């Protein structure tokens, strides 16, 4: 039908799907809302995947994908309070089981650093931690340099109640010394 598809952007959509299906369904739901409001041009679809941008469109070919998923769309995002359902994603379920095992009495008070390329994935992991009453802090591009050091210091403190340090791969960088964590999870790959 003459439409062009950017393969790399479609691959990114599939990477989000492998992180958790609600990340794709959220975009699908927002896409449908935009179409109803007439804000989306039918002739050309621009696909943008920037961290946390609520104006992102779903990748070409992903429109309507939420009807195949085991939930109503829109369960991703920072402001959402819907249950995370780690069992819907292999990676999320393994992370959940690892963290649950870490919190068992007698396991030495392990702490974990979790790195993701997508702030939306960090949103879901943060909600999972909140649902399980696991203390966590989150460092992404919105955190000032002054606050970053306070977060790092608190996480590194052995008496801290923080279990997880959620880190955006694009916000990390020079000067982060996360010696308080004895486990590291790179949640999704990057090119």
Q: Where in the sequence are the language-model features?
A:
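Conserved Helicase C-terminal RecA-like lobe
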Residues: 2-164, 170
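Conserved RecA-like helicase motor core of SF1/SF2 enzymes
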Residues: 134, 142-145, 169-191
């Amino acid at each position: 039908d003459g439409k062009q598809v950017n393969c790399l952007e479609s691959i990114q959509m599939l990477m989000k799907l492998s992180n958790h299906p609600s990340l794709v369904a959220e975009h699908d739901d927002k896409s449908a809302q935009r179409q109803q409001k007439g804000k989306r041009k039918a002739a050309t679809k621009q696909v943008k995947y920037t961290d946390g941008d609520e104006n992102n469109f779903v990748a070409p070919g992903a429109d309507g994908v939420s009807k195949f998923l085991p939930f109503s769309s829109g369960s991703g995002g920072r402001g959402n309070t819907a249950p995370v359902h780690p069992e819907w994603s292999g990676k999320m379920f393994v992370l959940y089981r690892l963290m649950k095992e870490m919190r068992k009495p007698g396991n030495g008070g392990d702490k974990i650093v979790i790195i993701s390329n997508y702030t939306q994935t960090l949103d879901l992991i943060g909600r999972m931690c909140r649902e399980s009453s696991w203390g966590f802090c989150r460092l992404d591009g919105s955190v000032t340099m002054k606050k970053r050091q306070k977060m790092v210091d608190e996480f590194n403190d052995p008496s801290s109640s923080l279990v997880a340090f959620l880190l955006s791969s694009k916000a990390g960088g020079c000067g982060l010394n996360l010696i308080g964590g004895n486990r590291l999870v790179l949640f999704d790959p990057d090119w």
